Amino acid sequence: MPATLHDSTKILSLNTGAQIPQIGLGTWQSKENDAYKAVLTALKDGYRHIDTAAIYRNEDQVGQAIKDSGVPREEIFVTTKLWCTQHHEPEVALDQSLKRLGLDYVDLYLMHWPARLDPAYIKNEDILSVPTKKDGSRAVDITNWNFIKTWELMQELPKTGKTKAVGVSNFSINNLKDLLASQGNKLTPAANQVEIHPLLPQDELINFCKSKGIVVEAYSPLGSTDAPLLKEPVILEIAKKNNVQPGHVVISWHVQRGYVVLPKSVNPDRIKTNRKIFTLSTEDFEAINNISKEKGEKRVVHPNWSPFEVFK
């Protein structure tokens, strides 16, 4: 029997009391005018949650699309992220992001990665880059800085009014435990944005975050070319049975698991498709849960932060 699709309108609550739409538009790898068109399409289609980052180099396009959409700013949940070369100056970095976005504030500001890149290795004054050492490795600094120091600075930002909440991204359970137990910690992160999809379900991390009142956000929810979920036989069979597209199946699985989902696309039809969900049967839901158990887990995004252990 065909499933009944509907636009997702579900809202989750941050530990600040703020409301966050469960499905948002991701803009990673959306370049220049593509990002503008994607955000404009999304907002006109009813999205009210847009996720960007300084390192995406598209904040100006995202901000212009928000302005041109005609949707009141207070109706849109906007997230951006602190890049790793600016861990020592998050307020300066946030000011720069706000200037590029053309906004007075963002709703959520995330530490993009727990590792700091040493700005001493930056070339051509390009702060939004991945500086490398002479041997070509990332200029990761674990000697002079750590993410706890970054968090101690970030947790003061909501008081400025420049962001309504702060959180983290790509944090493992161990790194979250270290942050929460640190002497200078006064604020539990509002969110932890991590890679999640049926080949990397992150059950333990999701449960830990929920136990601490941290909202989980899923990036790369449809996998990528390295994790071709939309061609998985289990996904295709469920899609065929319910007369929906494979993307509907995967996004609906995420939504039923109860966290924020951030599908990325610059294709207008896919942007609209990614907000349409249906209720999976218990049998189908469990079948998707079992994909990683049968095939093994596969991470799509795994940059080398050596010697820092990001995912342990």
From Swiss-Prot:
GO function term, MF aspect, one: glycerol dehydrogenase [NAD(P)+] activity
Could you tell me which CDD domains the record lists for this protein? AKR_AKR3A1-2 (cd19117)
Q: How does activity depend on pH?
A: Optimum pH is 6.5.
Main location per the UniProt record = cytoplasm
Q: Tell me which GO cellular component terms the UniProt record holds.
A: cytoplasm; cytosol; nucleus
Q: Which residues form a coiled coil?
A: none
Highest taxon in the source lineage: Eukaryota
Asked whether the keyword tRNA processing is assigned, the reply is no
The conditions that induce or repress this protein are given as: Expression is under the control of GAL4 and REB1, and is both positively controlled by galactose and negatively by glucose. Also induced by salt stress and in response to DNA replication stress.
Broad class of enzyme this protein falls into: oxidoreductase
EC number(s) given by UniProt: 1.1.1.156
Q: Where in the cell is it found?
A: Cytoplasm
Q: Which residues carry this modification: Phosphoserine?
A: 306
Provide the catalytic activity annotation. glycerol + NADP(+) = dihydroxyacetone + NADPH + H(+)
Mind telling me which residues the site (Lowers pKa of active site Tyr) is annotated on?
81
What is the recorded phenotype of mutating residue 270 to H/Y/K? Decreases catalytic activity
Q: What is the effect of changing residue 264 to R?
A: Decreases catalytic activity
In the UniProt entry, which residues are flagged as the active site?
Answer: 56
Q: Which residues bind substrate?
A: 112
Which purpose does this protein serve, as stated in its record?
Glycerol dehydrogenase involved in glycerol catabolism under microaerobic conditions. Has mRNA binding activity.
Q: Which family does it belong to?
A: Belongs to the aldo/keto reductase family.
| PANTHER family from the UniProt entry | ALDO/KETO REDUCTASE
- Protein name per UniProt: Glycerol 2-dehydrogenase (NADP(+))
Q: Which organism is it from?
A: Saccharomyces cerevisiae (strain ATCC 204508 / S288c) (Baker's yeast)
